[in-house]
Amino acid sequence: FQRTPNWYMPVPNYHERVPDGMRWLFTHVPHYAQWYRFWLFWYSCDAPLEMARVDPGWPHKDRSVGPMNEWVRELMAGYLHDQFKDRPDLLEKVIPNYPPAAKRIVLDNGIWPATLKRDNVRLVTDPIAEITPRGIRTRGGEEHQADVIIFGTGFQASRFLTPMKVRGRGGVDLHEQWDGDARAYMGITVPNFPNLFLMYGPNTNIVVNGSIVYFSECEVTYIMASLRLLLEN
């Protein structure tokens, strides 16, 4: 059951074994691993930003937000056309109608298209109307029988730490202070809540670029430095 299709970026070697030659370089060439990590950082953090840059005078705002965004759209649309050239019925359902980078782009090595084209898989885009004793009924009236239903309905992105109740100095409630607008310094610390450090906190979510692993490491470095300052002073 699909509410909104995703854009897919072709990554042929995704989850593949690291080649022996590169493994040798990691082991024997000084600082090669550090250089490669820096290259990955640049490639995944800085390079994609141009793709999301909005050109105010761009004439095709119904499909993209600028020339680089349009280029990426053509690249990914071509990938989908190639993957589903034998299934035009699916191609119509998987092409998004919004600009790339408006939602997270999925990295794909061909597994997702191959899964959708299996004989025992059916992609339903008709909105869900209700859950029934036998499965799911869509808005068009069709009932789809199911033994197991997995709810992938999204996230309450601004309700951090829910359902926990967190109280700070003077008994102030964290969610009442935020009042639906979660904010934190560097996404980590919050006024009136001493000794509270957040990981993956407000406004640190990534959509266009970056690695949550790297961002988490930066947050841990900041938190450890803060704890050291507290202990030493």
Where do the protein language model's features map onto the residues?
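N-terminal FAD-binding dinucleotide-binding subdomain shared by FAD-dependent oxidases/monooxygenases
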Residues: F1-N233
